[in-house]
Amino acid sequence: MKITLKKTLAAAAVFAFGGTLAAQAIGSKPVYLLSANPAVTIEPIATTGDKIGGLIVRGIPDGMGAYDNGQGGITILSNHEVAINDAIAKKSASTTSTWGATITKFNYSPNSRTITSASNLFNDVNFWNYNTGAYQKTPIGGEPKNNSKDSFGWGISRFCSATFSPAGTFIYNGVGYDGALFTTGEEVGDNSRGFAFDMFGNGWQLPRVGMLSFENIVPTRKPGPNTVALMNEDGSATDS
C-alpha cells in the first residue's frame, strides 16, 4: 500500500491566519491565545463540545499534526489526553475494543476557514505480545512476564504530545514503510505503551520504544537504514 502526501504543515499554522482584525471569539467560541502582532489574527476553529457532523469534539486536546490532504484542504490530527480513571471515560469502558484516549481527525477548508468534517481516527489497533514476540488483535496477555497479570487492557490512557512524520520518513532505498505516521504514547507511568498510527487509523504498538511515561515520540527525519526516535518522559515516573 503506497501513501502519497504532498506537504506537511505545522499544526500551529492551521490556527493562525494573517489579517488585521483583533483576536476575538467566533460565535460562542472562547479565545485562548491573543496575538502580540497586529498583523496576525488568531481564530479558534473548533473547541471542546462542538458538534461536527455526528461527532462531539472531546476535551483535553494535546499533541497534534497536520498535512495537506491533496483535496484542497488540511487534515489535522489531535490527541485527547483522556485518562481511563476519569469518571466520564469509564462509562465507555469496554472489554472488546479500545476506549479512553482517542485521536480526532479533522478536515479543514482554508477557503471557508472552517472544519468541514471530524471523525475518530481509530480503525484497527494491533497490540504487541512481549511473550510471543508477535502482534495480536487484543492487548490481553501481552504484558512482559515481570508485569502484573492483565496489566495491559483495552483502555488507552492519556495520549500526550505527538509527532506527525510525512511519507518518506520511514523508507530508505526501497526498504521500510513509505507512508506517513502519527506517533504518540501513554503518559501513565512505567506501564505506558507507545503507538504509531497511519492516516487510515490503523495503529501499532511500538515494543522497541519500551514502556515509560511518554511525553512524545519524535522520529528523526534523517534518511538511513535505521530509524532513530527521541523520547522524553513525563508524568510521575522517575526511574525508567
Can you say where each PLM-predicted feature lies in the sequence?
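Gram-negative bacterial Sec-dependent N-terminal signal peptides
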Residues: 1-24
